[in-house]
Amino acid sequence: MRLPWLAGCAIIAMLPLLWLPVLPGPCSLAGASALALALIRLHGRAVAGVAMTLLLVVWGVLSAHQALWPTRHLTGAIRQAEVILSETDGQTLHRGQMVRLRGRYLFPPVGVTLYGELAPAPACAGQHWLMTLRLRPVHGQLNDGGFDSQRYALAQHRPLSGGIVAASALDARCSLRARYLASLTRRLQTYPWRAVMLGLGMGERLSLPTEIKVLMQNTGTSHLMAISGLHIALAASLIMLLLRGVQYILPGRWIGWRLPLLAGLAGAVGYAWLTGMQPPALRTCLGLAVCCALRLSGQRWTAWQVWLCCLGAILVADPLAVLSQSLWLSAFAVAGLIFWFQWLPLPAGRWRWPWKTIIALVHLQAGVTLLLLPLQLLLFHGISLTSMAANLLAVPLVTLLAVPLILTAMLVHLSGPEIVESLLWLAADRVLAVLFWGLRRLPDGWLTLDARWLWISILPWLLVMGWRFQSWRHSPALCLSVLFLLTRPFSRQPPADEWRVTMLDVGQGLAMVIERHGKALLYDTGPAWPQGDSGQQVIIPWLRWHHLQLQGIMLSHEHQDHRGGLDSVLQAWPQAWVRSPLGWAHHLPCHRGERWQWQGLNFQALWPLPGSTAKGNNHSCVVRIDDGRSSILLTGDIERQAEQAMISRYWRHLTSTLIQVPHHGSNTSSSALLIRRVDGAAALASASRYNAWRMPSYKVVQRYRQRGYRWFATPQQGQITVVFSAEGWQIHSLRDQVLPRWYHQWFGAPADNG
C-alpha cells in the first residue's frame, strides 16, 4: 500500500473520535482487530485499506481509553505523586507531568493542572516536586457554540486538575529553557514591545497586554503570535540558509542538499524545544520530519500527497490531536492554499518588482481570507473585515523582519557581543512599533456573525469550483438551487406558537434565556470573577450566535453569582430594560402582584412582598411564565423561610409545568411543601460540579424525584433547553442528547460534585 493511501486511512480512522458518543469496549476492539487481521489475508487494495483503517481505529480508541484512565483510577482520594513542572505563573497556577505515583512510574506521564502555592522554593518550569494532591477529573461548562474546555484539555493531554495539599522540592533547579527565558526577560526590560518579542520568540503569550490581544483579534492577526508552522519553518529556513552559505567555502565534495535539510530540521526541533514544545510546535516538527523524509526518498510527491502524509503521521503519533482546533485550523489553511493555487492560480503577467510581489501577496492573502471563512466563523463566531489589509502589512513585517531579527538576537544572546544583540533587539522593537502603529490606524473591523452564516461561508469554495467548471453556463439551475439552499437559514422562521427557555451552563450561578420570535429576555446574568464575567464569556456570545435580540433582564437579587454579567450585557444592549426587587435606579419593580406581557407570554411576579426592604436570597424575584398551556416557575435563590411565606399568601398560583430549582439545589431550599404545591413535571438546577457547598444536595434531588419530577442539572447535562409548543414541551440537554460525545462525559465518580 502506498504511503498517501496509508495516510488517508489514518485520517479516516481517527475522525470517529470527533463524534463517538461512547468509546467501544474491549470486546468490540478485539472483534475489530480480528476482522482486520482476517481481511489482511485477502487480496486487493480496497480490502487492505479497510483492514488498515480498522486497525488504526482500534489504535485511536485505545489512545482515548489511555487518556481517560487517570480520570477513573487517580481521582477520588488524596494521592502522593512526583510532578515535573512544565509551565507555571510563579504563583498559584501550575501545569506539569505526573511521572511517579506511590513509587511507581507512570507511562506515559499524566498531564495535570494544579492550583496552590509552592514554597519555600519559587516555582519554575523543569522543577521536580513531591506533592500530596487532591486530584479530580477535568470538567467544563458546555454551551452551544461556546468554548469546549473538556475537549481542549484532552487534546492537550491534561485530563486531571487538582489542589496542592503539600509539596516539597526534590530538584529545585529550573530547566534550561526556564533559565534562558528568565535571562531574556531581564535583558528586554527596557524595550516597549518586549511582551510581543517574547511572544514571537518564545511563545510566551501570558504577559501580552489585553489591549494587544484584542487588537490582534479584531484585525485577524492573532495567528502570528502562535508558535507553530510559520515561526518554526522560518527558524528551519534560517539554519538551512546559514549552512548553505557555509558550504560555499567548502570543497565541492562536501557540498550537498541533504546536510542543510537535516540541519534545518534539527534547528526546528531545537527552536520548538526552546519555545516549550507545545502541542502545535510538536506537530509542526513532526510535519517537517515527514516532509524531510519524503524529500530524502528521492520520489516526486504532489502537494496533496505531502499534506496527506503529514496529517496522517500527526494523527497516528497522537490520535487525540484530532480534538485540537489548532490542528484543524492549520490543516485547513494549508489545504485551502493548495486548493487556491491549483484552482485559481495567479495569471502570468509582466509585472515588475515591487508590483509583482505586492500582487502575489494580495492573491495569497485573498485565498487565506476567503477559504478559511467556514472554520473562522465556526470557531470564533465572526470575521475581521480588516484582516486582509492587516495581514498584508503584518505578515511581511513579522516574517521577513521581526521574527528573523528576534531569532538572531536570541542566538546572539547566548554568546554575544552585547552591542550586536542590543542593535538586533532595538531593530525588532522598532519594526513592531511600526506594525502596531499601522494596525491601530485600521478601523475596528470585527464583525460578529450568527449561525445562519455558516452555510454562506462555504460559498468561496463553491465559487472557485464553479468558475473552473463554468457551472453557471452548463448547470444554471443547479447553481441557483445551491444558492437557495445556502441562503435558506435567513428566511426560515421558528413556529409562531413556539417559545424556549434555556438554562445556560455558567457554573455556580444562574443565567436563563427566554426566547420567542427572535427576541429574548434574561433571568439573571451569571457569576463574575476577577478577569471577567459570564456576560462577556457566555451570555453575549450565545445570544449573538443564536441571532437573538435582548429586550429585557429580570434580576432575581443582588448576589454576585446572579448579577455578575449585568454590566457587560447592558453595555452590549443598552436599550434593554431591567426588572428587579432591588429598587436601584432605572430598574422596574419586581414584587408580588406585578403582571406584564411579552411576545404573547404572561409574566406574574409572586415574590417578594411590595415594600419589603430585606436583602439576599429570600428577597429573590420569583416569576411565573405561562403561555396558557405550559408554564415555568423561576425562583432565584429563595430559601425555606421565603418559600413558606410565599405559599401561605399565593399558593393557588404556584402550579407550574417546570421549576427552576431554588438556590442551586441547596438543602436550605426546595421544601417538600413547595415541591408539592408546584406539582411540576421537571426540575432544572444550575450549579458547578466542583462547588464548595456540594450543591445540589442529594436530599433535594431525591425529594424532587420522589414527587415524580424529572431531574436536570447543568453539571450533568450542560446547557438545558426547554421547547414549548402547541404539542406540549420537550427538554433537550446538550451534554447527553444534542452533543453526546465521549469527551463530554462526566468523568470520575458518578455522584462527585465536591
Sequence positions of predicted segments:
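Membrane-interface helix/helix-cap signal primarily in integral membrane proteins
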Residues: L54-H223, D533, Q537-P541, W545-Q549, ...
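Aromatic-rich juxtamembrane segments at the membrane interface
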Residues: A155-C285, C292-A293, S422, S568, ...
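Core dinuclear metal-dependent hydrolase active-site scaffold
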Residues: L315-V316, L320-V322, R440-L548, G552, ...
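Membrane-interface helix caps and helix-loop-helix hairpins in membrane proteins
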Residues: A272-A281, L296-R300, A317-L327, P374-L377, ...
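Cap/insert and terminal regions of metallo-dependent hydrolase folds
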Residues: E643-G718
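Transmembrane helix-bundle segments that form internal channels/tunnels in multi-pass membrane proteins
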Residues: M1-L74, I78-E82, L243-I255, L259, ...
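Metallo-beta-lactamase
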Residues: L550-D561, I659-H663
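Active-site HxH/HxHxD metal-binding segment of metal-dependent hydrolases
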Residues: M554, E558-G593
